[in-house]
From Swiss-Prot:
One of its GO terms (molecular function) is flavin adenine dinucleotide binding. One of its GO terms (cellular component) is cytosol. Signal peptide: none annotated. This is Methylenetetrahydrofolate--tRNA-(uracil-5-)-methyltransferase TrmFO. It is found in: Cytoplasm. Catalyzes the folate-dependent formation of 5-methyl-uridine at position 54 (M-5-U54) in all tRNAs. It holds the Pfam family GIDA. PANTHER family: GLUCOSE INHIBITED DIVISION PROTEIN A, METHYLENETETRAHYDROFOLATE--TRNA-(URACIL-5-)-METHYLTRANSFERASE TRMFO. HAMAP family: TrmFO.
Length: 429
């Protein structure tokens, strides 16, 4: 039986990786390069369209626990992330082009994979084939209409991406390398601002022209990817407690903490490109250039990619899917990735691993399995398939139901999660 996967993003490639390694015939439908969404540029698989960071690796962090669980389950995304990483303190950041190339090469190395570079418009749900919808949050066109009819409509939210600038256009005489509180390996470039410089920047930011979006609703902005200009609307000091917070950073030229800081993170290993951390925006492009050049050290910044906003689409999973991320009516149709309501690169990839595991069991005529809810991934999947009012969700400590205080959870939860995941893997074998 052939397994058809629609979409070769982070979720789709994890499903494929799990199946291909066991000899299952896989057919991947990927519309790139014939058709690109508004945020996709690279024809390779596993393209990162927002930040190049896969968040923290620390086991005192929910994202770090999720990565550790995925490593137990043999994640292709993490395998390539480690191979293509760039310095980013405690975060796992990657050279996005090398990362996508790595994933693509791994998938195409199998003889039992067929890749069809075409846009899918609908699915014939005949019972002799399995289908996986992993089309991501930018699902659109005729397929989106077909899927909407199948699932009873979509839920939506908006998020934005940050600009990327050329490394050789940064004036390093006005910036300094450091990580907060002196932790890490000083991988971030910090652009310090005085009170006067910040006030000028803030005034220009809130008065800058924005690109209008159809049906835009500020209440539908995803909290992690809010445009910087929307955060600024909350008050003049809102950025000082958000993306421009200076805490934990000392300017070596003054020996003092600056009034505000804008951080830059490497996009590639050689430092040819940097992204502005927390600077997601939907300002008009000439306005982005003008305002970025108000930042000390970036007066001559060359923008390689401008920030943009896009609408993200996901299905109402509790109504549509069972606990295995399978359609409640069509037993040969699975879903994976952000289309299910998870949020984040790692979270999306993790759902693909889970779906791959259960498709293998389906093919072997075994009972499908749910993950223990005392794993980070299991708790996340439980949320998106049972929530009474689904909102996009990323890995966090609140999902895992254990009787611990906040401090104890941060220190000990990883032991419980990883032990449960190892037991799950042993049960599979």
């Amino acid at each position: 039986m052939i397994v058809n996967i629609i979409g070769a993003g982070l979720a789709g490639v994890e499903v494929a990786w799990k199946l291909l390694n066991t000899g299952v015939k896989v057919r991947i439908f990927e519309q790139k390069p014939k058709k690109f969404s508004t945020v996709h540029k690279n024809p390779n698989f596993g393209e990162l369209v927002c930040s190049n960071s896969l968040k923290s690796e620390s086991l005192n962090n929910a994202e770090g626990i999720l990565k550790a669980e995925m490593n137990i389950l043999d994640s292709l995304v993490l395998k390539c992330a480690y191979r293509c990483r760039v310095p980013a303190g405690k975060a796992l950041a990657v050279d996005r082009d090398k990362f996508s190339q790595c994933i693509t090469e791994h998938i195409l190395s199998f003889d039992n994979v067929e890749v069809i570079r075409e846009e899918i418009k609908s699915i014939d749900l005949k019972e002799d084939e399995i289908w996986v919808v992993a089309t991501g949050p930018t699902t659109d066109g005729e397929f989106a209409n077909w899927l909407s009819n199948l699932t009873g409509g979509f839920l939506n939210f908006f998020d934005a991406v940050a600009p990327i600038i050329s490394g050789d256009s940064i004036d390093f005489n006005k910036c300094f390398f450091a990580d907060r509180y002196g932790k890490g390996t000083s991988d971030y470039i910090n652009c310090p601002m005085t009170k006067e410089e910040y006030e000028r920047f803030y005034k220009e930011l809130i008065n800058a022209e924005k690109i209008e979006m159809e049906d835009f609703d500020r209440k539908l902005l995803f909290e992690r990817c809010q445009p910087i200009e929307e955060i600024a609307k909350s008050g003049e000091k809102s950025l000082l407690f958000g993306p421009l917070r200076p805490v934990g950073l000392i300017d070596p030229r003054t020996g003092k903490m600056p009034y505000a800081i804008i951080q830059l993170r490497k996009e590639d290993e050689n430092g040819n490109m940097y992204n502005l951390v927390g600077f997601q925006t939907r300002l008009k492009w000439p306005q982005q250039k003008r305002i970025i050049r108000l930042i000390p050290g970036l007066e001559n910044a060359e923008i390689l990619r401008y920030g943009v906003m896009h609408r993200n689409t996901y299905i109402d999973s509790p109504k549509v899917l069972d606990e295995f991320l399978r359609h409640k009516k069509f037993q040969n149709l699975f879903f994976a990735g952000q289309i299910t309501g998870v949020e984040g690169y790692v979270e999306s990839a993790a759902t693909g691993i889970f779906v791959g595991i259960n498709i293998l069991r389906f093919l072997e005529k075994k009972e499908l399995v749910a993950l223990p809810t005392k794993t980070m991934l299991g708790a996340l999947l439980n949320y998106i398939t049972t929530s009474k009012q689904l909102k996009p969700m990323y890995a966090n400590f609140g999902l895992v139901d254990v009787k611990m205080g906040k401090k104890e959870k941060r220190e000990k939860l990883h032991k419980i999660c990883l032990e449960e995941m190892k037991k799950f893997l042993y049960m599979l074998k």
